A protein has these predicted regions:
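N-terminal segment of the mature soluble domain
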Residues: 41-110
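C-terminal/domain-edge helix-coil "capping" segments
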Residues: 20-40, 50, 131-191
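Surface-exposed short loop/turn segments
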Residues: 85-150
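Structural motif
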Residues: 11, 35, 92-95
């Protein structure tokens, strides 16, 4: 009985992880940060996307995943007139921001795979045959960068890949989960 339960549990966990189509491909952290880790308490979230609705959805989802009160959407904080970098940095510091998360789509890779047909009917072959077919896969690469407002430099960078995403909502949730998990593991964001 225990063996059956263990096998069933293992199978269900395997199926659960097999459904996830997003993974963290690469990440880099500033070596100086690992010497003095202190989680960021308040971050500005920026997701420059093609349209304002998608940007709002993405930024809202990211802020929702970060610890309560730690994230602020750029669409509610930044003004179109905020073009001077030094003035903006001073304003961010004055308002208590210590980090900025910028997430953007960097590439969409397309690949075509030929899947050969199969024949049935034994050694004399081709009594019954299913034809081959082509499949096209799209991999969306999203880069996320974490900047220190005080030091004015990149502290962490990561690239996620999402294979054949079915919806923006699901893809964003998977990407944000992968990034949040990595940032918390590195001690950059609080758990």
């Amino acid at each position: 009985m225990k063996t059956k339960f263990f096998l069933l549990s293992t199978l269900l966990i395997g199926l659960l992880f097999a459904c996830v189509s997003t993974k963290l491909e690469k990440s880099w952290a500033d070596p100086s940060f690992s010497l003095k880790p202190s989680p960021y308490k308040k971050v500005l979230v920026v997701a420059p996307l093609k349209d304002a609705a998608s940007q709002r959805i993405a930024e809202d989802k990211i802020v929702k995943q970060i610890k309560a009160g730690a994230g602020v959407q750029s669409y509610s904080y930044l003004k179109p007139t905020d073009t001077d970098e030094k003035l903006l940095q001073a304003q961010l510091l004055k308002d208590g921001f210590d980090g900025i998360i910028v997430m953007h789509l960097t590439d969409v890779e397309k690949s075509v795979t030929y899947n050969p047909g199969t024949s049935y009917g034994g050694w004399y072959g081709y009594r019954s045959y299913s034809p081959g077919y082509y499949t096209e896969d799209k991999t969306f690469l999203v880069e996320t960068n974490m900047y220190s407002v005080k030091d004015d430099k990149l502290m962490w960078s990561g690239t996620t890949s999402s294979l054949n995403p079915t919806s923006l909502d699901k893809s964003m949730d998977e990407i944000i989960y992968a990034i949040k998990t990595e940032l918390q593991k590195k001690g950059i964001l609080e758990k």
